[in-house]
Amino acid sequence: MSSARFESKILSRAELVAAVAAGRLPRPLVFTNGVFDILHRGHVTYLDQAAQLGATLVVAVNTDESVRRLGKGSDRPLNQVQDRAALLAALGCVDAVTSFHEDTPQELIGELRPDLIVKGGDYDMDTLPETALVKSWGGRAVAIPFDFERSTTALLGKIRQG
């Protein structure tokens, strides 16, 4: 059986950096990142809005090891990085998915040099080191307010309470 078509959007970090450097991904390039452990309506709305800000949306997913370092709980992530990447790649608004093992995506952002970085409305963009980085080459940092207040952590809390 052949792979699902969306799996071609999942790229190694090196493949993604090479594709961007070769101009194979149209600009403006929009970058966002996250854990995306249990994909919910808040995630997909946010990603669709981010995609509308440019020609290409790149999503970087935390590896399982980096999720554990974030302190979200000993049982997190619930879904392995390959599965989280596949679900994101299946979304029509997402053009490319990769993963990163560091605590922050700063190094990857430096390699890709996106035109915009996008985070959810709960981030203060002025305090993020990624903001200064993207601005250093003329890029922008944008916070997208949440239309749907959803949280994987809160959802898991409800499930655990029964």
From Swiss-Prot:
It is an enzyme of class 2 (transferase). One of its GO terms (molecular function) is ATP binding. The keyword Nucleotide-binding applies. Pathway: Nucleotide-sugar biosynthesis; ADP-L-glycero-beta-D-manno-heptose biosynthesis; ADP-L-glycero-beta-D-manno-heptose from D-glycero-beta-D-manno-heptose 7-phosphate: step 3/4; Bacterial outer membrane biogenesis; LPS core biosynthesis. GO terms for biological process: ADP-L-glycero-beta-D-manno-heptose biosynthetic process; lipopolysaccharide core region biosynthetic process. Its EC number is 2.7.7.70. InterPro entries: Archaeal_FAD_synthase (IPR050385), Cyt_trans-like (IPR004821), RfaE_dom_II (IPR011914), Rossmann-like_a/b/a_fold (IPR014729). The keyword Nucleotidyltransferase applies. Pfam families: CTP_transf_like (PF01467). It comes from the Bacteria. Belongs to the cytidylyltransferase family. Catalyzes the ADP transfer from ATP to D-glycero-beta-D-manno-heptose 1-phosphate, yielding ADP-D-glycero-beta-D-manno-heptose. Cannot use GTP, UTP, or CTP as substrate. Is not active against the alpha-anomer substrate. Is also able to catalyze the ADP transfer to beta-glucose 1-phosphate in vitro, yielding ADP-beta-glucose. PANTHER family: BIFUNCTIONAL PROTEIN HLDE, FAD SYNTHASE. This is D-beta-D-heptose 1-phosphate adenylyltransferase. It comes from Bordetella bronchiseptica (strain ATCC BAA-588 / NCTC 13252 / RB50) (Alcaligenes bronchisepticus).
